[in-house]
Amino acid sequence: MIQITVIQIDNYGPWTVTPNPRRESDLQALQSRLYADLNLMFGAHKGLVFYTRFDNLIAITNGIDLITHKRIQESIRNRYPFTVSMVIASAETPYEAQKLATETLQEYGSAQDENRKEVLDVANELVVDGYVQIAHIDINNITGTLTDIVSAYDTYLNVNKVKLALMEELLKYNALLFFIGGDNFMAPSNGMSEEDFLDIFNRINKKYKIELKAGIGIGRTAEDASNLADIGLEKIRGKLVDKNVCTLKQDDFLESKMGMGKIYHPQF
């Protein structure tokens, strides 16, 4: 089971134009700061936040309880000129979890309802003994094939084409995908196999002539899974595996490191 928290700024659209439209540069900076602060706050508890549309964010929050969510919510109220609402849900797949959380939040009223403030609810249950699977996907040799050859905007356009293709393909497996900068994407993907990813990569390569690779991490929290995914991706880059996917599981990884005589102090 994966635990997802949907985060939404309360009544944000009307606030941006009241009493007059606010400077766009200020709004962009404010949204970026909120994303950064939320990642730091949830990250302190081994969670991970993705910005989606900036006024609506999705966080992977396995291991994070309701009290911690409440404290984060209060901290945002104290730091920002607006409030946020949060709903937590769990499911076998990321898409199912975020959908359930979203539907529960919508039951409290519109995102632009001035009377709906600081909703905090659990749609079904908090995850006690679940896991997180995250794939860190990137484009093979984007520097040599795009960055150093075509314009900055054309590279950006191609990256977004790949992003959309990945989002549509992964949705067939009830997985999610988020852009995380450069040519990198992260996909919460509980239940997917390496073969599923290879099939998707082959279809995208046939259509766009772009090769992809992915480290896949499976851990108890978003931080554990994403760290393992990063290590798996480095194994592919270092040609330590013979295919474009590499899966690392938390317990297996810790056992292999301990067996090499290294001392680890995992925080579970």
UniProtKB/Swiss-Prot annotation:
Keywords: GTP-binding, Hydrolase, Magnesium, Nucleotide-binding. GO terms for molecular function: GTP binding; GTP cyclohydrolase IIa activity. Its EC number is 3.5.4.29. InterPro entries: GTP_CycHdrlase_3, Nucleotide_cyclase, Rev_trsase/Diguanyl_cyclase. It catalyses: GTP + 3 H2O = 2-amino-5-formylamino-6-(5-phospho-D-ribosylamino)pyrimidin-4(3H)-one + 2 phosphate + 2 H(+). Changing H136Q: Decrease in GTP cyclohydrolase and pyrophosphate phosphohydrolase activities. GO terms for biological process: biosynthetic process. Its cofactor is Mg(2+). PANTHER family: GTP CYCLOHYDROLASE III. Belongs to the archaeal-type GTP cyclohydrolase family. This enzyme couples pyrophosphate hydrolysis to the guanine ring-opening reaction. GTP cyclohydrolase and pyrophosphate phosphoydrolase activities probably occur at independent sites. Catalyzes the formation of 2-amino-5-formylamino-6-ribofuranosylamino-4(3H)-pyrimidinone ribonucleotide monophosphate and inorganic phosphate from GTP. Also has an independent pyrophosphate phosphohydrolase activity. Homotrimer. This is GTP cyclohydrolase III.
